Amino acid sequence: MPLWKHLGGVNREIACGVSIGIQDSVEQLFDKIQTELDAGYRRIKIKIAPGWDYDVVKQVRKKFGRILLMGDANSAYTLNDIDLFQKMDEFKLMMFEQPLAYDDMFDHAKLQQEIKTPICLDESIHSLPDARKAIKIGACKIINLKLGRVGGHKQAKRISNYCRQRDIPVWSGGMLESGIGRAHNIAMATLEGFTLPGDVSASKRYWHEDIIEPAVEVTKKGTIVAPEKPGIGFAIKRDRIDKLAVKTSVIG
């Protein structure tokens, strides 16, 4: 049985997005966004930081119109920046991801009260109690679930179920996984609560040659189709792993 079916997944075809870092120029950012849109990706996430925020997002909106666009701040701001976030409401972004410190949900709740754009928590969510607290105090309206951070499939499903029952959208984040980790992210993203495009992309976007076959590919519709083969659904290229290994340990 495929892993995604074993987990109770319902969406075999999952929508994909990409994350684009801070560039040397806005023109370079435009080029990267266009490349990803041409590749079929449905949602564009751009990193924002002081000095690379309002004007950049404004130019991206002007050039690309109503694409699905979000900003990821990686905790780069404080409550002193409320006015900035209020100004950026005009761009109708999908969300601001982790705008404030990862360990201060109360500040996020304060910010969310002052802006219209949904806040998405990422680094703040390590467990179901974290998600419960964030939702209860109004610290976010969206959650980014990272499988490795929350402790595996069981915990991820518990969190996604909790969020789904409270109409809090969830999406799958990425942590620069190889094909094996990516296969697990794909399986997780088929769960019912995962309703927004996640950071699950094609193997070739990060790897010259992945350690699984076939490589993960994105369709022209900007989706990934979960495999029907048993387990993670991909064959592990052990010869490739052996070639790349720096050190090995045998347990048991």
Residue ranges and their predicted role:
Residues V18, N144, D199-V200:
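Structural signal for conserved beta-strand scaffold positions within catalytic alpha/beta enzyme cores
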Residues G148, G173-M175, S201-S203, K221, ...:
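Short, loop-centered acidic/histidine patches that primarily coordinate divalent metals
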Residues I46, G51-A183:
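Catalytic core of soluble alpha/beta enzymes
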Residues K141, I168, F194-L196, G222, ...:
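A short pocket-lining beta-strand/turn micro-motif at the edge of beta-sheets
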Residues G21, H126, V150, E177, ...:
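Short, glycine-/Ser/Thr-/acidic-enriched flexible segments
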Residues E177, G181-A215, K229:
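Active-site pocket-lining/capping segments in soluble small-molecule metabolic enzymes
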Residues M1-L69, S75-L79, K87-E90, E114, ...:
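N-terminal capping/lid subdomain adjacent to the active-site entrance of alpha/beta enzymes
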